[in-house]
């Protein structure tokens, strides 16, 4: 008997339902972490997303040198956020 089977039996749910709920919980936790990381970077520059940060750099309100690492981090985090949201729709 697998761990999934034992836990499912203990909580009177099917293994499939347990896995589905586990995946959802994991993805929601991951999404919360990503959104928190996005918030920290966005707040630092007073923007909502990577496009606003890019706009501030282009207008000279933020130097490219200062925002370089955060720009790519924010871009990657926003991509990760969308990926997680799509996975949540499928679960």
Predicted regions, residues:
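Amphipathic alpha-helical coiled-coil segments and their boundaries
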Residues: 13, 20, 27, 56, ...
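Low-complexity, intrinsically disordered short peptide segments enriched in small/polar/basic residues
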Residues: 1-4, 59, 81
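Amphipathic alpha-helical coiled-coil segments
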Residues: 20, 24-34, 38-41, 74-84
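Long amphipathic alpha-helical coiled-coil segments
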Residues: 83-91
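A broad, low-specificity signal for short, low-complexity segments enriched in glycine/proline
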Residues: 1-4, 34-37, 43-46, 90
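Short E/K-rich amphipathic alpha-helical oligomerization segments
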Residues: 40-64
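Residue-level signal for short amphipathic helical patches enriched in basic/charged
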Residues: 14, 29, 48, 91
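Short, charge-rich amphipathic alpha-helices with coiled-coil/heptad character
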Residues: 1-24
């Amino acid at each position: 008997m697998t761990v999934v089977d034992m836990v499912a039996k203990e909580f009177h749910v099917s293994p499939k339902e347990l896995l589905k709920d586990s995946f959802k919980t994991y993805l929601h936790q991951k999404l919360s972490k990503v959104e928190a990381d996005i918030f920290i970077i966005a707040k630092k520059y007073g923007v909502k997303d990577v496009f606003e940060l890019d706009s501030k750099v282009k207008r000279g309100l933020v130097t490219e040198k200062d925002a370089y690492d955060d720009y790519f981090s924010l871009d990657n985090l926003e991509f990760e956020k969308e990926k997680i949201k799509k996975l949540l729709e499928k679960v």
